From Swiss-Prot:
A motif (YXXXXLphi motif) lies at residues 10-16. This is Eukaryotic translation initiation factor 4E transporter. Pfam families: EIF4E-T (PF10477). Interacts (via YXXXXLphi motif) with eIF4E1. Interacts with DDX6/me31B. Residues 201-211, 248-263, 934-953 have a biased composition (Polar residues). The gene is 4E-T. The keyword Cytoplasm applies. InterPro entries: eIF4E-T.
Length: 1010
């Protein structure tokens, strides 16, 4: 053993070889020397049996030392976990160096026979099987791996070459060494070329491609953790160069030439980007278009091999690798591997150039033929348009022969157009006649191919419709109706000029709106005549279906309108246009032609105060008539009145009917007095518009919906417990009756009480008084301080009288002070202009009260009645009705603006009539019951009578009364100023009561009305 072996007695490669499973169980060959046995690294067994077993094991596992088995085991182990090329190179190099010690030891021992003889003669040959856990060289790996090229190219190069050559020469001599030599040959062959073949089989699938770890972005493949992007190409280039160096000294000609062929083939596969040798040109798609760029590609490949482009990560190297071998889709492995790359798209421009040459010749012929056909078609279309225009303008029905002629035109045009498309079916036809400026596309010729009526498609009214600002497409819609049967008479003249024209989109929308605005007041005969005329005209299929839809909508509207459940919402601007319909309605009411189910819903306006009041009044009258006829029994009405599930409004109507029916039996003259009812129905609704304007939010609902809403007024909803309403209930209910009676059936009790006290004429006008009191919003301050004048001393004796009576708290002349207690403070929503009729609230004049003290009992009785009705009706109206108001601010303002414009003058007249009636009730001897308008002295007296209030009495009453809470809310200075009349006059129309304001705050999360 010379010094060279001593220096390499336990080399780094031996430690590297311990990483393999097969090698780690075997002792390195150099460990058999006696110098190493003293170190005690290895456990030594000197048993002969163990030696024989170990020798058999070593002889059996000689080929275990060969890298074939290790490579096979490596391939199997690497298939599960993808390792980098660097780790593969480390293992192969360790295997290489370990293999080079085998021939030297075999030369010493001289073959298997010498081995066996020496082992059997008891030489101290150590056991090859070791415990690999006794030494761990894994922590030495990084340092060895960094210097592996220095080791391979340095001291061991001569020794390795000598070993290989001696092994090769030895392998050609004897039988048993020849097996070893062939083993070594194949071992080196495998060392150099198993890895490329392994790369071949693994690069076919990018999952196992360890030779090139690049993979397509987004393909879902994970990059290996040990892969380094920076010097990867350098490693592959160095590996290929070293493989060439290692194969060149081998003298084995056939195997080396075969391996060089394999290596060059693999290199061409790896770096050329295509299967050059394997795949014929016909099957590769990219050879059809890449022939120009092959030289450029080769330059790119040379640059890649030499490693001059370290950052170009062989973007197109994988496209053809697995192309026809494993049939993997191209997008799996091909494509960009980093975000810095771009994709080349080849061949499309060449394809387009080739196709353009073949297509342009056909196009020229086609365009010439198309021009001829289009010119002929245009002349035919002009003729057919003239015929159709004549037929449309002068005849309503097209004759059958003209229809056949136009149909023939349609068929020929279809045939011509299809014949144009057929000559070149196999090629993509790109007919663009707009490229030729002479041949513009005729849309009429194209659209006439549709099997519609030509009279619908082409007419001469397109200029008109364009001037009207209609849509481009509106000329293919024709109005089949002479006039829409849903129109009002005012709309018919406006649409008369469009009878034979084609309606625009706006006209169609207007027709849809008119279907909603349909009313039965219009003569139905005209609508039926319109329909019969329309059905005679020729109708296209599409427009016929559209018109049928309109007719269905109209019939639905006709079905809904007799019922009381579908009243459409219409703008206030439409109300001004249809005031004459209201006059028609009042005329029919006075004539007695309008029945109850058709009430107020047939009118296309929203239910104003007059409509709601008239409907309620006519319900009462209709029920009274049925009572007289015997259709409805008195007992049934009483049962309904006692039924707790009956809505409050229904109970109100029933109670009124029972009262009037009982009084009509006593005084049958009243029911037959038409003048009183005429005054009520026509004049009274304008005076109480404020009260019923609160029900305007129910304009889209029917009467039973209103009743259901009102029925919730008695329920303890959160709306019933605003602070002002609770305060008003605490003070108002103590005046006349116990509150428990009001909780059960307040309206009925009050009406029964009034039936015992007051006369017939008072009962007839009782809803008017109730509504009049409900008109005034609840004013804490300001109600009753409208016109406080200098005549404060007139009623001082009457004041002292009425204060002594327990029932009466205020004078009869101070009607508004009743409301001054029960109505809330106004919240001003507009200017401070005073209401024109606000001073006319008192029905009793000062001079008549002073001149006639005889009628003081009548006065007290009337005041008691007013007080009773007020205390309950204010409870009902401000609770039951106002509770159902969603947002009183919006519609209150809206309705007030509209109502002030239209009904202002009639308000004053009707109020004068009402207060004249009230005055005649309280003074029957002085004023005969003339049903007409009251004399002009009433208005002056009313203004006088409004100033009868005593401010000192009011202030004393407000502060001293234990039931009044005003002193808790307002300072004495403000109360004194208010009682002195220094607060501004309030426009009641623009005032919102405190109670309504509190409810609107509670409703602030509800529906918002603009």
């Amino acid at each position: 053993m010379d010094t060279s072996k001593i220096s390499a007695r336990y080399s780094k490669v031996d430690l590297l070889a311990l990483r393999y499973e097969g090698k780690s169980r075997q002792r390195p060959q150099c460990s058999t020397r006696l110098e190493l046995q003293t170190l005690g690294f290895w456990k030594i067994n000197l048993n002969t049996a163990a030696l024989t077993v170990s020798s058999a094991y070593s002889n059996q596992n000689k080929n275990r030392l060969s890298p074939e088995a290790d490579n096979s085991s490596l391939i199997c182990s690497n298939s599960s976990s993808i390792s980098s090329r660097r780790a593969m190179r480390n293992r192969e190099r360790a295997n290489n160096y370990y293999q080079r010690f085998v021939p030297t030891d075999s030369l010493l021992i001289s073959g298997e026979d010498k081995d066996k003889d020496a082992l059997s003669h008891g030489q101290p040959y150590k056991l090859n099987i070791i415990d690999h856990r006794s030494i761990s060289s894994s922590h030495l790996m990084p340092a060895f791996a960094k210097r592996r090229f220095v080791i391979s190219k340095g001291s061991n190069s001569e020794e390795s070459n000598e070993g290989i050559n001696t092994c090769a020469s030895k392998g050609k001599a004897a039988s048993s060494p020849s097996r070893k030599g062939s083993e070594l040959d194949t071992a080196e062959t495998c060392l150099n070329f198993v890895q490329p073949d392994h790369d071949q089989c693994m690069s076919s699938s990018p999952t196992f491609s360890t030779s090139r770890q690049e993979r397509r972005i987004g393909s879902g493949r994970l990059l290996p953790r040990s892969d380094n992007w920076d010097y990867k190409n350098e490693k592959t280039v160095e590996a290929s160069i070293e493989n060439e160096k290692e194969t060149s000294p081998n003298g084995s000609g056939s195997t080396s030439s075969l391996n060089q062929h394999n290596q060059s083939q693999h290199r061409s596969r790896t770096f050329s980007g295509r299967l050059v040798e394997r795949v014929p040109e016909v099957t590769d798609r990219r050879f059809q278009y890449d022939s120009k760029k092959s030289f450029d590609r080769q330059g790119i490949n040379n640059r890649r091999i030499s490693g001059k482009e370290p950052f170009s990560t062989q973007s197109r190297s994988k496209r053809g690798n697995s192309y026809l071998i494993h049939e993997e889709p191209e997008w799996f492995s091909a494509g960009p591997k980093s975000q810095l790359e771009t994709i080349d798209l080849h061949g499309f421009e060449d394809l387009e150039k080739n196709e353009e040459r073949s297509v342009t010749e056909d196009k020229n012929n086609q365009i010439q033929q198309l021009d001829k056909n289009l010119d002929a078609q245009a002349s035919k279309d002009e003729a057919s348009m003239r015929n159709s225009n004549d037929s449309l303008n002068f005849r309503e029905v097209i004759p059958s022969d003209e229809k056949k002629h136009t149909d023939e035109n349609v068929v020929t045009s279809i045939q011509n157009s299809t014949d144009l498309g057929h000559p070149n079916k196999n090629k993509p036809i790109q007919m663009q006649p707009s490229q030729n400026p002479e041949s513009e596309f005729n849309f009429d010729a194209f659209l006439n191919m549709h099997p519609l009526d030509n009279s619908v498609l082409s007419n001469d009214e397109t200029g008109k419709s364009d001037s009207k600002g209609t849509s481009r497409f509106s000329r293919w819609f024709r109005q089949k109706e002479a006039a829409n049967n849903n129109e009002f008479p005012g709309f018919r003249e406006s649409h008369a000029q469009e009878k034979r024209g084609i309606p625009s989109v706006k006209d169609l929308e207007a027709q849809m709106i008119k279907v909603d605005m349909r009313t039965d007041l219009i003569n139905p005969i005209a609508g039926s005549l319109c329909q019969t005329v329309q059905m005679e005209k020729p109708i296209a299929r599409d427009t016929e279906a559209f018109k049928k839809l309109l007719q269905q909508l109209g019939s639905q509207a006709r079905q809904h309108h007799p019922c009381n459940d579908d009243c459409r919402t219409i703008n206030l601007s439409n109300i001004a246009n249809h005031v004459h319909l209201e006059s028609k309605l009042h005329q029919k009411i006075n004539d007695g032609h309008l029945q109850q189910p058709e009430l107020s819903v047939n009118v296309p306006t929203m239910p104003t105060s007059s409509h709601v009041f008239l409907q309620k009044r006519l319900e009462i009258q209709h029920l009274i008539q049925r009572l007289h006829c015997g259709d409805v029994s008195h007992d049934f009405l009483e049962k309904e009145l006692d039924n707790p599930s009956t809505p409050a409004a229904t109970k109100d109507v029933i109670a009124t009917v029972l009262n009037e029916y009982s009084h009509s039996k006593r005084n049958p003259v009243v029911t037959g007095d038409p003048n009183i009812f005429t005054q009520q129905s026509f004049l009274q609704p304008q005076s109480v518009h404020q009260h019923y304007s609160q029900e305007l939010h129910s304009q889209n609902t029917a009467n039973h919906t209103i009743n259901q809403l009102i029925s919730h007024g008695n329920s303890p909803t959160p709306l019933a417990f605003t602070p002002t309403s609770v305060l008003r209930k605490m003070t108002a209910d103590k005046d006349t009756q116990s509150p428990s009676t009001y909780c059960q059936n307040p309206q009925y009790h009050v009406h029964q009480q009034n039936a015992k006290q007051v006369g017939t004429r008072e009962n007839v006008l009782e809803p008017q008084l109730t509504a009049t009191m409900a008109v005034q919003p609840r004013m804490i301050l300001g109600g009753g301080n409208f016109a406080i004048g200098q005549n404060n001393q007139h009623l001082s004796p009457n004041m002292s009288q009425s204060r002594n009576q327990q029932v009466l708290k205020w004078t009869s002349g101070n009607m508004q002070m009743v409301h001054g207690k029960t109505f809330g403070r106004p919240i001003l929503k507009g200017g401070l202009n005073s209401m024109p009729h606000s001073n006319s609230a008192l029905p009793f004049t000062a001079h008549k009260i002073e001149m006639q003290p005889i009628h003081q009992p009548h006065l007290q009785q009337q005041q008691h009645r007013f007080k009773a009705v007020q205390s309950v009706e204010s409870n009902l109206n401000t609770e039951s009705v106002h509770q159902n108001i969603t947002s009183p601010v919006g519609w209150h303002q809206l309705y007030m603006q509209h109502q002030q414009q239209h009904h202002h003058t009639r308000q004053q007249l009707s109020q004068r009539v009402i207060y004249g009636e009230m005055h005649r009730q309280s003074n029957p001897q002085m004023s005969p019951p003339v049903p007409g308008f009251s004399d002009s002295s009433d208005s002056g007296n009313v203004i006088k009578a409004n100033s009868l209030t005593s401010p000192s009495y009011q202030r004393d009453e407000r502060i001293s009364s234990p039931t009044n809470q005003l002193a808790q809310w307002f300072s004495p200075e403000l109360l004194a100023k208010a009682s002195a009349g220094k607060l501004p006059l309030l426009n009641v129309n623009q005032a919102l009561s405190l109670e309504e304001f509190e409810r609107s705050i509670q409703h602030s999360s509800g529906v918002v009305h603009n």
